[in-house]
Regions:
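Walker A/P-loop
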Residues: 67-88, 185
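SF2 helicase catalytic motif II
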Residues: 150, 154-158, 164-208
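Pre-Walker A (Motif I) flank of P-loop NTPase domains
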Residues: 67-73, 97-99, 147-148, 207-208
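Conserved Walker A/P-loop ATP-binding site and its immediately adjacent core
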Residues: 79-84, 91, 97-118, 156-159, ...
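Conserved helix-turn-beta segment of the N-terminal RecA-like "Helicase ATP-binding" lobe
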Residues: 108-131, 225-233
């Protein structure tokens, strides 16, 4: 009985019930309580309930509920970055403002759209994405003006804002996905230029930024990135090395029309799967 009680206490302590504050964000006095309830209920109703936060998510999840905290978050692949973005989006939407998610890859945009639609459609929010050719159609402009949650590639968004910078005036949260893809290649430079434009807008102070990444530099480079995203406001990045699964190294050996995968299980020697 004691063990069961301790397990339940631990589960509750790290659940969304405890992590999501009861008090609404600024502007969310009328809607937040109901949206909070629907958000938790939607995740609970999934085939495998998703109410407990993993160790990798806990610090970032708590900070993501503070709409004034610009975040830089580095979590390993499959360690729960999307849930951090969803919590930040919930707080923004409850306050009556829209959400923009920038994803550097088209395939990632489509995947992110599906994930956010699954989470936020039951709450009554619209979700759409913009990717493909850099041109802007009337339909694309309508998406940017009207959808509650927009997922866009840097190229598409940059083109849209050069045509009409007011398209994101009522955006309250910008999520920069795969933040480590800001670098020296042509596509990475485009991403960096877009981020710089967003940070230098006259209304940048009214818009929260959350940067998510699986890989971030150490030392001074990380400090510089955090200071850049936070516009030099003091604050630490969130980092975790915890993963929900174990990693194993292996060798794939191709043999004609079949393959053999050899895992190296530390002292156990090769393993044939």
């Amino acid at each position: 009985v004691r063990l069961c009680r301790n397990m339940l206490d631990d589960l509750w302590a790290h659940s969304l019930h405890e992590t999501l504050p009861s008090d609404p964000p600024e502007g969310g006095e009328e809607r937040y309580a109901e949206l909070r309830r629907l958000f938790i209920a939607s995740l609970y109703a999934r085939k495998s309930a998703e109410l407990e936060l993993w160790p990798s998510q806990r610090e970032a999840a708590k900070r993501s509920t503070d709409v004034s905290d610009d975040l830089v978050v580095a979590l390993p692949t499959s360690a729960g970055k999307t849930r951090i973005a969803e919590i930040a989006a919930l707080m923004c939407l409850a306050g009556g403002r829209r959400v923009l998610i920038v994803t550097p890859l088209r395939a990632l945009s489509a995947q992110t759209e599906r994930t956010f639609r699954q989470t936020f459609s039951p709450l009554g929010f619209s979700v759409s994405s913009l990717y493909g050719a850099s041109g802007l159609s009337a339909g694309d402009e309508d998406v940017l003006r009207s959808m509650d949650i927009i997922i866009a590639t840097p190229e598409k968004l940059d083109f849209a804002l050069r045509n009409d910078a007011s398209l994101i005036d009522d955006i309250g949260l910008v999520v920069l996905d795969e933040g480590h893809l800001i670098g020296p290649t042509e596509r990475e430079i485009r991403y960096e230029i877009l981020v710089q434009k967003l940070l230098r807008r006259g209304d940048a102070g009214t818009r929260r930024i959350v940067c998510l990444s699986a890989i971030l530099p150490d030392g001074q480079q990380l400090e510089d990135l955090t200071a850049w995203i936070r516009s030099d406001v003091e604050g630490e990045p969130v980092r975790s090395s915890w993963r929900p699964t174990r990693q194993r190294f292996g060798t794939l050996v191709w043999q004609g029309d079949a393959a053999r995968l050899n895992y190296d299980l530390e002292q156990q020697g090769p393993f044939l799967a």
